[in-house]
């Protein structure tokens, strides 16, 4: 601003001040500098807001104007819009205003219908969402249940286990997830299944699995010796496992087998002890248990213990000799000691002879009562622990006394208590003289439990305790929880399963170890299917052949829906490992099927292949499912899936290694084979498949620039009309096409119109002088092309299928350009 402007402004200010001072009625307002600054800022911001709005309007006009939009027209339209009339409140009407009443009722009905529909839609959406969450939660629960290997509190025990290594940590080289012990077991399972599948005599699975113990330590070897001993029982044929396991005869046989194992183990222990201390043992005399026990006592009891009674035999306490001969399972040797000391033992010789000669090592009720009475009167507080122990075993009395001075090891305690177990309920025995197998099982599993046996340091000891008391399921479930011992637990379960000794859970959702209503209190059930699936999960993706061998054990098992578990596991295995050709076989070029691993297990592979194909289809793996259905000779499903696969890629440009190229080659291979072999599917599906192949050929020619050949193909297909007379016919025929064809109609119409437009431009670019055709022929061709373009427009408008607005616009645009 120049000097004159400032001078003029100063003059106006002085004049204004003079006029203000001249008015004496008005009070003077004095402002300080801060107030003046604030007032100036307010004025400035007001001016800037107006300026910025104008600037924004200018920028908007420039931006939208560059795109061909009229900003003033848009502003007017926006200002004219009003949301007030969308849902205006209903106005009160007079009683005689019929028109107003009807209008309000109509509006009310519309609003009510809209509100009801809204509520119903939201309710349905909420219900679907809730159901979806419930289904998803059920799946998550199943995964959690499959992860938790134990039951009860043990499943939530996250304490660090410092267990020793029982198997080699070094696995075989390569891609296998199996270590050397697991691979050795898998090899034995393969041998076993081969015999079964080929119809040979069923081999002894215990012996096969026990041979693996040679690769491992002594604990594993002893375990399999025990399993072999305990499973060597005579079962009633054609009887389920629960009836067999609950029968008195079988339970008595289990006790006899357990005692035999414990006695043989102790005899082996005495042999090792004696031969390890030959100088101290002074072994000699006639070979046999008696001399072995004498030598063993030279080591165990080098000096006489105070309190021992009834003298000695050859320098050793009588009752110690009798006890250890019985502990080694040799009653004849014990009888030899009794005969030598019969004068000191009173009636015991008679009682022992009856005990030794009885079938079940049981005295007659009269003799038993007599012995028990003698024990209560004279021996309960006797100072000779061996004498008390022998009387408690023969008379099965005073079961509450653990005889800890003699039975100081767990195996000794087991042997003593199993000798006292009784099965007959004569009603005459007092509670302190009666111990049933069920009571003993409950005592070991529930009263003592894992904490009593220090399972982290001695897992095999607790397994032995449970197994020798016929609690097979609890023993297997316990061992399975130990990561390093899991493979042994699984194969023990397989042995029990094959021998019909395993009690299985009735449902797959049950915990690994469970008790079902109606079962005896002492019995537990093992979820065998889950056990096997948890074990194979480790290696099924890397070793599908081995996993298949284990799944074969489930061939007679059903899930809750009645589906065969072998089929289900195989289908999941194939989908997981993607080893379709190796497991299910492969289709050769001539249409014959190359057998897969599954052929070893069944002669009729179609149900299995169809099942796997169905699972693949449900998972959206249509290409794999089509190949599997082709393998199973299910032509209808093959072409149905191929139609779904081909439909999206029909209009695409073919390129090497592309999805379309792969699917096209696959479809052509199927088509050639089906035609050569005369294979046909459902007529509707069949015609759709071959029409899609023709459309692929059409688009390949079109994209390659061979428009005349492409036009010949579309003309022969008669998919779209090319003259007005055939429009009605093509529209009627369109209703019979499948969705796979209809979805490609827009692209077919555009490609056909492009061909007509290209031919039209080519015709227009031909001058009469350079053309060999007469002018009349060119004009006729010109008219024909325009007519064909109009026919396509008419057809696009008449078909009962909604094409995109962009398609219609492009069709009309090209048709207009031709006119």
UniProtKB/Swiss-Prot annotation:
Biological process annotations from GO: nuclear envelope organization; nuclear pore complex assembly; nucleocytoplasmic transport; poly(A)+ mRNA export from nucleus; positive regulation of SMAD protein signal transduction; protein import into nucleus
InterPro entries: Nucleoporin_int_Nup93/Nic96
Molecular function per GO: structural constituent of nuclear pore
Pfam families named in the record: Nic96
Outcome recorded upon mutating residue 388 to W: In NPHS12; doesnt affect nuclear envelope localization; impairs nuclear pore complex assembly; doesn't abrogate interaction with NUP205; doesn't affect SMAD4 interaction; doesn't affect IPO7 interaction; impairs SMAD4 protein import into nucleus; impairs SMAD4 protein signal transduction
Keywords of the record: Disease variant, Membrane, mRNA transport, Nuclear pore complex, Nucleus, Phosphoprotein, Protein transport, Translocation, Transport
CC terms in the record's Gene Ontology section: centrosome; cytosol; membrane; nuclear envelope; nuclear membrane; nuclear periphery; nuclear pore
Membrane topology reported for the UniProt record: Peripheral membrane protein
Subcellular location: Nucleus membrane; Nucleus, Nuclear pore complex; Nucleus envelope
Modification Phosphoserine, positions: 52, 66, 72, 75, 80, 430, 767
Modified residues (Phosphothreonine): 49
Quaternary context: Part of the nuclear pore complex (NPC). Component of the p62 complex, a complex composed of NUP62 and NUP54. Forms a complex with NUP35, NUP155, NUP205 and lamin B; the interaction with NUP35 is direct. Does not interact with TPR. Interacts with SMAD4 and IPO7; translocates SMAD4 to the nucleus through the NPC upon BMP7 stimulation resulting in activation of SMAD4 signaling. (Microbial infection) Interacts with SARS-CoV translation inhibitor nsp1; this interaction may disrupt nuclear pore function.
Involvement in disease: Nephrotic syndrome 12: A form of nephrotic syndrome, a renal disease clinically characterized by severe proteinuria, resulting in complications such as hypoalbuminemia, hyperlipidemia and edema. Kidney biopsies show non-specific histologic changes such as focal segmental glomerulosclerosis and diffuse mesangial proliferation. Some affected individuals have an inherited steroid-resistant form and progress to end-stage renal failure. NPHS12 inheritance is autosomal recessive.
Assigned protein family: Belongs to the nucleoporin interacting component (NIC) family.
Protein name from the UniProt record: Nuclear pore complex protein Nup93
Native species: Homo sapiens
Name of the coding gene: NUP93
């Amino acid at each position: 601003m120049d000097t004159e402007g400032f001078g003029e402004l100063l003059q106006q200010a002085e004049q204004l001040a003079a006029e203000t001072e001249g008015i004496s009625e008005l009070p003077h307002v004095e402002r300080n500098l801060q107030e003046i600054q604030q007032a100036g800022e307010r004025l400035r911001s007001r001016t800037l807001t107006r300026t910025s709005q104008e600037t924004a309007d200018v920028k908007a006009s420039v931006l939208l104007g560059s795109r061909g939009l009229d900003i003033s027209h848009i502003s007017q339209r926006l200002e004219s819009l009003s949301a007030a009339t969308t849902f205006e409140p209903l106005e009160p009407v007079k009683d005689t205003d019929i028109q107003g009443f009807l209008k309000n009722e109509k509006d009310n009905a519309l609003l009510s219908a809209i509100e009801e529909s809204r509520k119903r839609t939201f309710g349905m959406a909420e219900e679907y969402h809730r159901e979806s969450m419930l289904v998803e939660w059920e799946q998550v629960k199943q995964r959690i249940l499959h992860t938790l290997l134990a039951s009860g509190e043990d499943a939530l025990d996250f304490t660090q286990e410092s267990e020793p290594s029982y198997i080699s940590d070094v696995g075989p080289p390569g891609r296998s997830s199996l270590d050397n012990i697991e691979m050795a077991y898998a090899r034995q399972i393969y041998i076993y299944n081969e015999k079964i599948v080929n119809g040979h005599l069923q081999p002894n699975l215990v012996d096969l699995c026990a041979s693996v113990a040679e690769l491992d330590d002594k604990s594993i070897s002893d375990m399999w010796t025990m399993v072999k001993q305990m499973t060597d029982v005579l079962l009633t044929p054609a009887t389920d496992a629960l009836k067999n396991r609950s029968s008195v005869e079988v339970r008595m046989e289990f006790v006899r087998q357990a005692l035999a194992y414990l006695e043989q183990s102790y005899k082996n222990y005495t042999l090792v002890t004696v031969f390890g201390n030959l100088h101290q043992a002074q072994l000699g005399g006639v070979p046999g248990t008696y001399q072995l026990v004498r030598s063993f006592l030279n080591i165990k009891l080098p000096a006489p213990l105070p309190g021992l009674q009834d003298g000695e035999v050859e320098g050793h306490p009588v009752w110690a000799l009798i006890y250890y001969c019985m502990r080694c399972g040799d009653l004849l040797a014990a009888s030899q000691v009794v005969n030598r000391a019969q004068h000191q033992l009173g009636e015991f010789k008679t009682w022992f002879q009856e005990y030794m000669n009885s079938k079940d090592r049981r005295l007659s009720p009269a003799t038993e009562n007599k012995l028990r009475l003698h024990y209560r009167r004279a021996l309960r507080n006797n100072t000779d622990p061996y004498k008390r122990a022998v009387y408690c075993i023969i008379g099965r009395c005073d079961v509450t006394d653990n005889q800890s001075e003699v039975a100081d090891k767990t195996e000794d305690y087991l042997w003593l208590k199993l000798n006292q177990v009784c099965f007959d309920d004569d009603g005459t025995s007092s509670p302190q003289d009666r111990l049933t197998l069920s009571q003993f099982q409950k005592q070991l599993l529930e009263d003592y439990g894992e904490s009593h046996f220090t399972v982290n340091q001695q897992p095999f000891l607790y397994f032995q305790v449970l197994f020798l008391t016929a609690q097979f399921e609890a023993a297997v479930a316990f061992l399975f929880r130990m990561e390093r011992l899991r493979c042994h637990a699984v194969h023990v379960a397989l042995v029990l399963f094959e021998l019909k000794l395993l009690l299985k859970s009735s449902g797959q959702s049950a915990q690994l170890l469970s008790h079902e209503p109606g079962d005896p209190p002492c019995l537990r059930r093992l979820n065998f299917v889950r056990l096997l699936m948890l074990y194979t999960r480790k290696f099924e993706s890397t070793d599908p052949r081995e996993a298949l061998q284990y799944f074969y054990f489930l061939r007679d098992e059903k899930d809750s829906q009645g589906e065969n578990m072998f089929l289900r596991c195989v289908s999941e295995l194939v989908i997981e490992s993607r080893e379709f050709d190796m497991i299910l076989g492969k289709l050769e070029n001539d249409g014959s099927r190359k057998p897969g691993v599954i052929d070893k297990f069944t002669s009729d592979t179609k149900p299995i292949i169809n099942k796997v194909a169905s699972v693949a289809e449900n998972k959206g793996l249509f290409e794999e499912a089509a190949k599997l259905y082709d393998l199973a000779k299910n032509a209808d499903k093959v072409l149905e899936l191929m139609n779904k696969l081909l439909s999206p890629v029909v209009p695409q440009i073919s390129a090497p290694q592309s999805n379309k190229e792969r699917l096209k080659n696959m479809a052509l291979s199927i088509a050639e084979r089906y035609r050569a072999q005369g294979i046909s599917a459902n007529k509707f599906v069949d015609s759709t498949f071959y029409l899609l192949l023709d459309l692929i050929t059409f688009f390949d020619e079109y994209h390659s620039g061979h428009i005349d050949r492409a036009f010949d193909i579309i003309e022969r297909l008669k998919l779209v009309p090319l003259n007005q007379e055939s429009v009605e016919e093509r529209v009627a025929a369109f209703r019979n096409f499948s969705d796979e064809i209809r979805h490609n109609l827009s692209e077919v119409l555009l490609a056909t119109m492009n061909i007509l437009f290209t031919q039209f431009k080519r015709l227009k670019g031909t001058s009469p002088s350079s053309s060999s055709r007469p002018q009349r022929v060119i004009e006729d061709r010109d008219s024909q092309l325009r007519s064909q373009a109009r026919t396509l427009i008419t057809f696009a408008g008449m078909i009962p299928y909604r094409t995109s607005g962009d398609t219609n616009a492009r069709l009309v645009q090209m048709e207009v350009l031709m006119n």
